[in-house]
A protein has these predicted regions:
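Short, surface-exposed ligand- or partner-binding patches at beta-edge/loop junctions that are enriched
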Residues: 89
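Rhodanese-like catalytic fold shared by cysteine-dependent sulfurtransferases
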Residues: 2-5, 17-43, 52-85, 94-130
Length: 130
């Protein structure tokens, strides 16, 4: 009886997690898939790391709006057209998921680099340094 109860709980939690992952409203992509997606020049590349991180290396043609700043939503609204897909990246993927959720909530079509800039570098993708 105890086993059945535990299995029921595990199944229920798995279902809830699966529903949450499907309803996030944006797509998380591997470095290869992200590279293919941003090859479309209509896609806007958004790096949500700090200005210092951005200056040390970023994806070509990316613009920088720090998601940790209190004015992120205002800057995004003033800078990013809702008619375009926004491709978001950060260092490891955590901040980009946060930014993607904020942007999606505000009506943007969003994709994000699941492994972040670290994964981009590890995959040997092009990096621009300023």
């Amino acid at each position: 009886m105890k086993k059945i109860f535990i299995m029921s709980i595990i199944t229920m939690l798995s279902s809830l997690y699966s529903c949450q992952a499907q309803n996030k409203g944006y797509k998380s992509l591997s470095a290869d898939d992200y590279e293919k997606a941003i090859a479309d020049t209509a896609v806007i590349r958004l790096d949500v790391r700090t200005a210092e991180e951005f200056a040390n290396g970023h994806i070509r043609c990316a613009i920088n709006i720090d998601v940790l700043k209190s004015n992120f939503e205002q800057k995004a609204a003033a800078t990013l057209p809702k008619s375009k897909t926004i491709a978001v990246n950060c260092r490891s993927g955590k901040r980009s998921k946060n930014a993607a959720a904020i942007l999606t909530k505000n009506g943007y079509q969003v994709i994000e680099l699941d492994s972040g800039f670290i994964g981009w570098q590890a995959a040997g993708k092009e990096i621009i340094k300023e």
